[in-house]
């Protein structure tokens, strides 16, 4: 691995409907095989369903759902003298957002509703109300960090 240059982060263009960078990143994560228009229709469709069901601003609800799923701490493996410890570390803002997006999408894909629009909208509503698999994933991560608090002095 070359240490000469830092990897340059690509600029994400805000989405067309809301003009929001987070929605755009979410869309890019949903996208498979470069099919952006399909991802767009899924995300916008899900946000329309959310708006109809919750009768509130879908963007606010989306941001709330992301905040409820984003982890504050996680565990990272650290090898010390032949033993591997799970060391709890704080999560950087960028990674918090990335993990929240990843977990929301994974939880939505694992649901049983018929279409992805239905699955995603249901998961977003659940996450906004602190329920669902994505929130459970965050709770598990926090529980893991809490259980390994004794090793927090190994932080780097």
Swiss-Prot record:
Q: Name one GO biological process term.
A: translation
- Kindly list the GO molecular function terms attached to this UniProt entry: rRNA binding; structural constituent of ribosome; tRNA binding
Kindly indicate whether the keyword RNA-binding belongs to this entry.
Answer: yes
Q: Where are the transmembrane segments?
A: none
Organism domain of life: Bacteria
The UniProt entry, under Gene3D superfamilies, shows:
Ribosomal protein S7 domain (1.10.455.10)
* Gene Ontology cellular-component terms listed: small ribosomal subunit
The cysteines covalently paired via disulfide bonds are: none
Q: Which InterPro entries match?
A: Ribosomal_uS7, Ribosomal_uS7_bac/org-type, Ribosomal_uS7_CS, Ribosomal_uS7_dom, Ribosomal_uS7_dom_sf
Keyword entries, A-Z: Ribonucleoprotein, Ribosomal protein, RNA-binding, rRNA-binding, tRNA-binding
Family to which this protein belongs: Belongs to the universal ribosomal protein uS7 family.
Summary of subunit composition and partner proteins: Part of the 30S ribosomal subunit. Contacts proteins S9 and S11.
Which PANTHER family does this UniProt record tie to the protein? Answer: RIBOSOMAL PROTEIN S7 (PTHR11205)
Q: What is the annotated role of this protein in its UniProt record? A: One of the primary rRNA binding proteins, it binds directly to 16S rRNA where it nucleates assembly of the head domain of the 30S subunit. Is located at the subunit interface close to the decoding center, probably blocks exit of the E-site tRNA.
Protein name per UniProt? Small ribosomal subunit protein uS7
Record gene name: rpsG
């Amino acid at each position: 691995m070359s240490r000469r240059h830092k990897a340059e982060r690509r600029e994400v263009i805000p989405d067309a409907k809301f003009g929001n960078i987070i929605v755009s990143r979410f869309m890019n994560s949903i996208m498979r095989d470069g099919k952006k228009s399909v991802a767009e229709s899924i995300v916008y469709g899900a946000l329309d369903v959310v708006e109809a069901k919750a009768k509130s601003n879908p963007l606010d609800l989306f941001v709330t759902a992301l905040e409820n799923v984003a982890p504050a701490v996680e565990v990272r493996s650290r090898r010390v003298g032949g033993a591997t410890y799970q060391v709890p570390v704080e999560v950087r803002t960028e990674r918090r957002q990335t993990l929240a997006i990843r977990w929301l999408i994974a939880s939505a894909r694992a649901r049983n509703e018929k279409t992805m629009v239905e699955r995603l909208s249901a998961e977003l509503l659940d996450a906004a109300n602190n329920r669902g698999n994505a929130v459970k994933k965050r709770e598990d991560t926090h529980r893991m960090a809490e259980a390994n608090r004794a090793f927090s002095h190994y932080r780097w």
